[in-house]
Structure formats: C-alpha cells, structure tokens
Amino acid sequence: MRTFVVLLLASVAFCFAQAAPQSDTLLIKKRNPLKNASFMFSAGNKSPDMPVGVWRNAGNKTSTGTIVWFHGGMTSNNCQKGLVAGGSLANMLPDYTVVSASACKQNHWVEPTTIEAVDDALDSLAKRQKKDIEEISLIGISDGSLGVITYSLWGKRKIKNRILMSTYGESLGPAAQVAAQTPLKNGRWRFIQGGADRLYPSEKAVPWIQEFCQNVGTQCDLKFDPQGEHDWSYWQNKHKDWILEIFSK
C-alpha cells in the first residue's frame, strides 16, 4: 500500500514537472519594533531557489511554536510568494513564528526537493536562533494543502497540528490509500471546506475528506460552510475561530 502511494505521488510530481536551481538565502521578517524590517541569511546549499519569509517576535520573547504556511498557486510563475504569503497568518497568531516558503513552476509542493528545502530553511532558522525546531504545525490553502500532506509524508519534523483549507486531496490518490500511510497517523488534522468553492466543488472534495478522516487513525475533523469560498481571505474574515481554536489547546 505504501509503495503504491509513494509511486502515485512520484507520478503526480512528474506531471507537475521537475528540476531545482540552487540558492543560499532565506528572508527573515521581524515584528515590532522593527516593523517591516528584513535581513538575509543562509538557508543552506541544498535548497532549491526558494525565497522564504519568516515572521517572529523581535527581541528575546519566546515563540509559542513554529507554523509553516503553504500558499496556493504552487505552479505559478511567481517564485517569491512566500515573502508575503504568511503575513496575515502572522498577524492572526502573533505569538508564533510563521515560516512561509515559496513554490512555483516545477518546484511545487508535490516535488520532494521542495519539501527538503522547507526542512533546510527550518534548519537554518534553528541555527540562527540557537534553538532546535523539533515540532511544527502546518497550514495550507488551495493546492498549498497538498504541501501539508506531502510534508507529513516526506518532512523530517514532528507535526502537532495541520489545517488544510479549500483543498482537493483526490489529486494525490484515493483517500483511504493516502490515509493508510504511517507518517500521517499522528498529530491533528483539520479540513476547512466551502460549498461555494469556485475551484473544488464540495460534492467532490468533501467525500474525499470524510473518507480520509475515517481512515487516518488520528484526530481529524472537517469544518464546512455551505457559503464558503475558495480564497484565504474568506476564511480569514468569516471563520478565524476555526483556525485559532486549533492553537488554543
């Protein structure tokens, strides 16, 4: 079963395309008193060309935890989405460090080297702050939710919470077969889906989510809004509580 899903993911990655140029920079954005300030540091030579935005408390205040944000539009030509994509989430969860990676073109979320680059960036951040990052939470919107699933399969860190918004998991394979993978059977899963999603109709997306939750063998739930739209702005404005309650426990 595991071999089947790994091969299926590999074929999905091939369909999305491949390759990975080299880079060695990671962008850090600090909060007040250095609002909008930024500086660069090495993300490691293994990384694809992935600009990464990081929002964290200035000074010595301890972060409550680290959240990785996976943006949507993972095959677009904009290869710097991560530099801004995590900003609104950071405002919503100011006590957390938010790491916002960038995917584009052939370096999308279903490409193993892109997931390796996320861990490489986290390694670099941990080195800079002189504190290991052993456990993280993951949040994805649209096809960024596929990044939540693939990091759960391929990433090297323990995962506490996952939120997947406006997703279509069927593109990774049948729900029961995806859910059967051992790395997915820990931590918490929350799916947030809308009945007015312009890209992923609920009659197709919701049954996959329900079957996944039934088979994954760990805490998993679905929050559904019949009027819910596809974009992050809708969930941010209408159902902020569905996101915040995951991080209040």
Question: Which ranges hold each PLM region?
Answer:
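Primarily recognizes the serine-hydrolase "nucleophile elbow" in alpha/beta-hydrolase
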Residues: 128, 134-183
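C-terminal catalytic histidine-bearing segment of alpha/beta-hydrolase fold enzymes
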Residues: 190-192, 198-249
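Short amphipathic alpha-helix adjacent to the substrate-entry channel of hydrolases
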Residues: 79-98
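Short beta-strand element of the alpha/beta-hydrolase
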Residues: 63-73
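Alpha/beta-hydrolase active-site loop
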Residues: 109-130
